[in-house]
From Swiss-Prot:
It comes from the Bacteria. It is found in: Cytoplasm. Participates in chromosomal partition during cell division. May act via the formation of a condensin-like complex containing Smc and ScpA that pull DNA away from mid-cell into both cell halves. Transmembrane segments: none annotated. One of its GO terms (cellular component) is cytoplasm. PANTHER family: SEGREGATION AND CONDENSATION PROTEIN B. Keywords: Cell cycle, Cell division, Chromosome partition, Cytoplasm. This is Segregation and condensation protein B. Its main location: cytoplasm. It comes from Bacillus anthracis. Pfam families: SMC_ScpB (PF04079).
Amino acid sequence: MDRTEQKSIIEGLLFVSGDEGIYPEQIAKVLEIEGNEVIDILEEMQKECEGAHRGLQIVQYAKVYRFATKKEHASYYQKLIEIPTAASLSQAALETLAIVAYRQPITRTEMEEIRGVKTDKALQTLVSHLLIKEMGRAEGPGRPILYGTTKEFLDTFGLKTLDDLPPLSEENEQMNEADLFFGSLQEISK
């Protein structure tokens, strides 16, 4: 395998490793080459990214390498964040999000028991909007996935912690879980 192909594969590995990044030792195992050769290639790639007119750079934090955007383009990334998304959240997604927020960690089956209908599509939408994520697995038959809210959920609603959620009275808990967020969620998702 030549150097160009090694760089191409490393570039892909950096991409798929995401924010977690990747250790040179992991790259070495994948490419079946020595660790010091991986470091040399990564350093070459860093210089290539710095010198070129590219939007990404390769950064190293605590022995982990990952892609990052260049700081000089930050104002453009901020503009993108401020553009409203075309896809809005459905009422089913809003109801499901409220249930997750108040009952997390919670399984899909538990959500469906509360809502009385399937939640598959709503869950997919909420995960794709980064408002909820898998938090682990429940004990019991089938070890179902547990869902909970994300940091993006807190940021979207201006909450520091889940303790900042409005309290629910016991008698209205199931009826009003979704209603608490409808107004603000519909505004955000427009």
